[in-house]
């Protein structure tokens, strides 16, 4: 099991990475969406998460989104593609990142 320790979050206890659905950038903060429906905002940039999380589990699909690959249900669209996650969230895939996703 893979864990991530985020300073100031969860009383300093590590978070189980497989419980993170996606992370959204909000300026110098990031919004983390969890499988239990919980959403938290942390004072870390998305790049920090990209460097801290395993590449095999997470993909940067847009300038403002990092998604857990295991929660991707499908890719939709022909010209402008987007990911549909298991919880129904739809996230645009940037043109630059489409090649990496498929």
Predicted region positions:
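Basic, polyanion-interacting recognition surfaces, primarily
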Residues: 1-102
């Amino acid at each position: 099991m893979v864990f991530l320790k985020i300073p100031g979050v969860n009383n300093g206890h590590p978070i189980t990475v497989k419980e993170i659905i996606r992370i959204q950038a909000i300026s110098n903060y990031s919004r983390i969406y969890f499988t239990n429906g919980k959403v938290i905002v942390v004072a870390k940039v998305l790049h920090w998460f990209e460097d801290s999380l395993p590449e095999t589990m997470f993909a940067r699909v847009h300038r403002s989104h990092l998604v857990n690959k295991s929660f991707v249900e499908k890719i939709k669209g022909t010209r402008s593609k987007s990911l549909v996650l298991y919880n129904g969230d739809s996230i645009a895939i940037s043109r630059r990142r489409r090649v990496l996703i498929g």
